Amino acid sequence: MSIKSLLTTVEPEDLQDVKNFCKVDGDLEDQEITGMMLSARRDIIGQVGDRIDDFFDDNWNFKYAVWLKTYHSYNNRDTSSNAMTFEIQDTYNSTINAMKDDYRYRVWLNDKAKNYDGEERNED
């Protein structure tokens, strides 16, 4: 799925996966959860990068980060509450950092392949 598609549409199976993760039954809040998923995707892609269109396809870390961000947004959506709210888990940040590392490596490989002219290059 292209990055453009990830930022504009949510497939029914992706919505169901998030609802299962958030332990949400029924379809009463599907529109809100879909919006939270799109927002999570935009945030994650913005942090990681958008030069490699297929990077997020079948990427478990991306899927898991979307689940975590959506779960956090869903459970902390009432901003007028006196109840204690929590920051997003370290697991989310670790997952984002792992994706950033993978992404930078893929960009480096792609750039190296484009610039390869048969001679050794100094990568420093």
Describe the residue ranges of each PLM region.
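Divalent metal-cofactor coordination and adjacent catalytic microenvironments
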Residues: 1-124
